[in-house]
A protein has these predicted regions:
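Transmembrane-lumen/periplasm boundary regions of multi-pass, lipid-linked membrane glycan transferases
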Residues: 15-26, 157, 168-278, 287-291, ...
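Short periplasmic/luminal acceptor-recognition loop of GT-C membrane glycosyltransferases, typified by
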Residues: 371, 375, 379-418, 434-441
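Transmembrane-helix motifs of polytopic, lipid-linked glycan transferases
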Residues: 69-93, 131-135
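Transmembrane alpha-helical segments
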Residues: 1, 165, 321-323, 337-369, ...
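Short acidic/glycine- and proline-prone juxtamembrane loop motifs at membrane-interface regions
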Residues: 114-125
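Membrane-interface alpha helices of multi-pass inner-membrane proteins
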Residues: 103, 147-163, 169-173, 290
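Membrane-interface transmembrane helices that cradle and orient dolichyl/undecaprenyl
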Residues: 90-93, 97, 132-148, 158, ...
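Extracytosolic helix-loop segments that constitute the early lumenal/periplasmic catalytic or substrate-binding loops
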Residues: 2, 12-43, 51
Length: 469
């Protein structure tokens, strides 16, 4: 649990980890988060709502820094979310065994298991949306203030963390709008109005984040769409190929399961009136998901974690299936047979998830080997005058925060494969950087070393500390 971020997409994992550590070390105000990467000057930057990074930072201040603390926070939120999802299944099925099996199925898609406690905000956003799902259902059964407030709390935190987690709320509300009683539209709208709060808060936060980043000339967390219709044919083919070859097999253990959903759904439409409560949210969720995928199409080539919040469709799809079985077969034997038939799928999900997690944790071997060394050089850096207050230029590291977070030093890296040009080095000097830390093949030629470095201060294994020219 105390491992540093590793494996697939450790760049993005280190962003959140860096923010939490900076909250702790610099005692930052909640609305002024900061990263190890200095960017233009200060390193002040923000993307998703940083509440949990802030709380983790406060925990560090009390208990001391440990990556294990971060993971336990993530695990606690995941456990709460999936416990409430189990409660939602129980509300719908009145069966403990069915609820447990369905809950395990939702919890064990291989991609979700791998990223579960691995620092990414997407997994906890999904879990929080499941909490919102439960309290929304409770509110529908009994419109109490407690259910409303708790539902709004969970959905607000989910959508503030990842906007795509809000698709589930829109899908749920859509049923009320489609099925309102004649002459009672206004009453329905008034009852649903509070559920717009998560989106209002998120809009306010997005505006603040844009303003905050602009103050420090930072565009790292800029959320831009890359729609399908703006790409060339070659780019579209590249996304499809990359997705199918890399991510598709890890959506669920049985990739063919997704292919069965369309005819399965079409079959259920024969009983639309009886299944309206399950059908409408499912259709709306699927429709919005298609729009989301088209808007961010290019991102799906390399960023599989964009899929995580879209797993909000799984509970809706599973309850749709249960409802079809109940309509077709009135006795409990059919449900029992369904449970028995589902066991191999759930078991395969669990098994595949374990293999995926182990495989992915050992990918990006270059980073894993390099960064484990960087996490062990704190005393060496202090001995050579590079304390936590002294910024450093870290090469070769094309990520914003990986090497800097592992060393726990602020500064610059050659982000996005930034060439070590005179202009870039001068920028480093302008923001107070006097040391160049070289690891692996950071300086590829003696010419670069002659131009940008003087005086090898010290070396430790394959890590070398220079003064900047």
């Amino acid at each position: 649990m105390d491992r540093f971020p590793e494996g697939t997409h450790m760049w993005r994992k280190c962003d959140g980890a860096s923010m939490a550590q900076n909250y702790a070390q610099n005692d930052l105000p909640f609305l002024e988060p900061q990263l190890h990467q200095r960017f233009e000057s200060s390193g002040k930057a923000v993307g998703e709502f940083p509440l949990f990074y802030y709380l983790i930072g406060k925990t560090y201040q009390i208990l001391g820094f440990s990556n294990e603390i971060f993971r336990w926070w993530w695990w606690g939120i995941l456990a709460l979310g999936f416990y409430l999802l189990f409660q939602w299944f129980y509300l719908k099925t009145k069966s403990t065994s069915v609820s447990i099996l369905l809950n395990i199925f939702c919890f064990t898609p291989p991609i979700l298991v791998y990223y579960g406690v691995e620092f990414l905000p997407d997994t906890i956003a999904l879990a929080l949306s499941f909490g919102g799902l439960y309290f929304y259902e409770k509110w529908r059964e009994k419109a109490s203030r407690n259910n409303l407030y708790l539902g709004l709390l969970f959905f607000s935190l989910a959508v503030l963390t990842k906007v795509s987690a809000g698709i589930l709320l829109v899908a749920l509300v859509s049923y009320e709008l489609v099925t309102f009683q004649k002459g009672k539209l206004w009453n329905t709208l008034k009852a649903l109005l509070p559920w717009s709060l998560p989106f209002v808060l998120t809009l306010i936060w997005v505006q603040y984040a844009a303003w905050y980043n602009a103050q420090f000339n930072n565009v790292y967390f800029l959320l831009d769409t890359v729609p399908y219709w703006t790409l060339t044919e070659a780019q579209i083919t590249g996304v499809k190929t990359g997705f199918m070859e890399t991510w598709y097999n890890e959506l669920l253990a049985y990739k063919s399961l997704w292919m069965l959903t369309l005819p399965f759904f079409a079959f259920g439409l024969l009983w639309y009136k009886k299944l309206q409560k399950e059908t409408v949210p499912l259709v709306v969720y699927a429709f919005i998901t298609v729009i989301f995928v088209l808007l961010f199409f290019e991102r799906f080539r390399h960023h599989d974690y964009y899929i995580i919040c879209l797993y909000g469709i799984l509970p809706l799809l599973l309850m749709y299936g249960i409802s079809i079985i109940k309509v077709l077969f009135k006795n409990k034997l059919a449900l029992l047979l369904f449970l028995l038939a589902s066991v191999p799928f759930v078991a395969a999900n669990v098994s595949t998830a374990q293999v995926t997690a182990e495989t992915r944790s050992h990918t990006w071997n270059y980073y894993n080997k390099l960064d484990n060394n960087l996490a062990l050089i704190d005393d060496w850096l202090n001995e050579n005058g590079v304390t936590k207050e002294v910024p450093v230029l870290s090469v070769y590291d094309p990520s914003p925060n990986v090497s800097l977070y592992y060393m726990n030093r602020k500064g610059l890296s050659n982000i996005y494969h930034q060439e070590l040009t005179g202009e870039f080095v001068q920028h480093a000097k302008n923001i107070g950087i006097k040391h160049l830390l070289v690891h692996s093949e950071g300086l590829k030629t003696e010419k670069e070393k002659a131009i940008y470095c003087r005086d090898t201060i010290s070396s430790k294994g394959n890590i070398h500390l220079f003064k900047l020219n």
